Amino acid sequence: AGCEAAAAAANLGSKTCLITMDMNKIGQMSCNPAVGGIAKGQIVREIDALGGYMGLVTDQTAIQFRILNRSKGPAMWSPRAQCDRNKFIWAWREILENIPNLHIWQDTVQEILVENGEITGVVTLWGVTFHAKCVVLTAGTFLNGLMHVGRTMLPGGRMAEPASYQLTESIAKHGITFGRMKTGTPVRIDGRSVHYEDMEIQDGECDFHKFSFMDTHVRHLKQLPCWTCFTNEEVHRILQEGLPDSPLFNGQIQSIGPRYCPSIETKIVTFPDKPQHQLFLEPEGETTQELYLNGFSSSLPMDIQIAALKKIPAFRDLVIYRPGYAIEYDFFDPTQLKHTLETKNIKNLFFAGQVNGTTGYEEAACLLYTSPSPRDPKTSR
């Protein structure tokens, strides 16, 4: 959301500053290293048609491409790409650094400045004041972020990254209410420990696909497969035994999750009659052994996560890089926004992405395009 917002504003002539906590994490995909999918792939192509960059970046960094829903009509065909997570970041950064009118500043916003009900700027952790006609907040899961692995809690906006503090409270002073939501991410697996012969390979499609309508015909990176397998009743038994230490079920986490992101423990509780759940093992990049286990998002204790996964034949010798975890974060009630995503209480303050209670890279990116802020003449000075 932040990348598309900054690029759109600058390309339309506004003098723009993109403030980010870490320039080396611009456009970081916080969860799975993939773009598109059912309903979402169409959104990426609409972003591209409107002049956005998400499709171009995805095409440049894709390591697998597939079209989902082929059994349905063309309107339902959904492009989906696995991406190299790190190359995705650097492709976005290269684009943003070369857009006229766009400056990048590495810092953390802690306070908004408001006069007579209208935004006038922000103040950062370093004490720098930026005066602005318009401010777009795309803070993701970083506002007062708190991560959970079992009963262990650690402040942060993402694994090994600090949370953002004071900004929520600064906004709330102006009558904008906020709540807490939670989401989660799965373990990252060392590919050298996986028995691929016990999984079903899922190759990309050999016919050429891309997201962008721009004339880019080169497949930049080596194309890699994904793999699929299933949980089993022994896995579910171990997960059930760990539920007393699950933050989702022992009262440690009180907040709710956005739609479409259920944890594995939620699946076994919600669907106790299902003997198995499908998992997808996805490569994180062209040159890394790190793998993402789609379908096994969890905040259970690390030893429970590992013990359960080792009951799957392909993971009997499992080695992980880091456990799955849940994260709680602040969000702002979207009923306080106009249809343009401008806040009703503060003129020219816009929210986009996960801070509105949404989820997904594509949804976050496209929300920016519902806002007139970048193309409003009064904000271009």
Where are these regions (language model features)?
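Flavin-binding catalytic cores
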Residues: 170-179, 235-251, 297-325
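C-terminal catalytic lobe of FAD-dependent flavoproteins
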Residues: 263, 270-283, 287-302
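A glycine-rich dinucleotide-binding beta-alpha-beta segment and adjacent secondary-structure elements
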Residues: 292-358
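Conserved small/polar residues in nucleotide/adenosyl-binding loops
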Residues: 369-374
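N-terminal Rossmann-fold NAD(P) dinucleotide-binding loop
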Residues: 2
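Core beta-strand elements of the Rossmann-like FAD/NAD(P) dinucleotide-binding domain
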Residues: 125-134
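Conserved N-terminal/central alpha/beta ligand/cofactor-binding core
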Residues: 7-113, 126, 138-158, 162-168, ...
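A conserved FAD-binding loop/helix module that cradles the flavin
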Residues: 157-160, 357-367
